A protein has these predicted regions:
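Short, solvent-exposed charged binding patches
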Residues: 70-86
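Amphipathic, hydrophobic secondary-structure cores in small proteins
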Residues: 11, 15-69
Length: 86
């Protein structure tokens, strides 16, 4: 897919605070979040519930999940950079 091509969003449903809700993200984000959850010994649903509980009022859940994936990727890159500088 080229730089200007539209990404396909994939919806997943979760129960958050007793209510069923759907979140639409690109497949790459779902894969990254599933891997992060597994590394922490959680299910994807548990990770989504935790992110939902921490987000600020008015903050979109999909955005919070994307930011988490990006932050974790940046942390990993920083660690790799530190190791390569040693």
């Amino acid at each position: 897919m080229g730089p200007g091509a539209a990404r396909v969003l994939s919806k997943r449903s979760f129960t958050l605070a007793g209510h069923r809700t759907s979140v639409a993200l690109e497949a790459e984000f779902w894969a990254a979040l599933a891997r992060l959850a597994a590394l922490d010994g959680q299910t994807l649903a548990q990770l989504v519930v935790a992110v939902d509980a921490r987000r600020q009022a008015g903050e979109q859940l999909a955005s919070s999940l994307r930011v988490l994936a990006l932050r974790k990727a940046n942390e990993y890159i920083s660690e790799v950079d530190k190791e390569s500088d040693s």
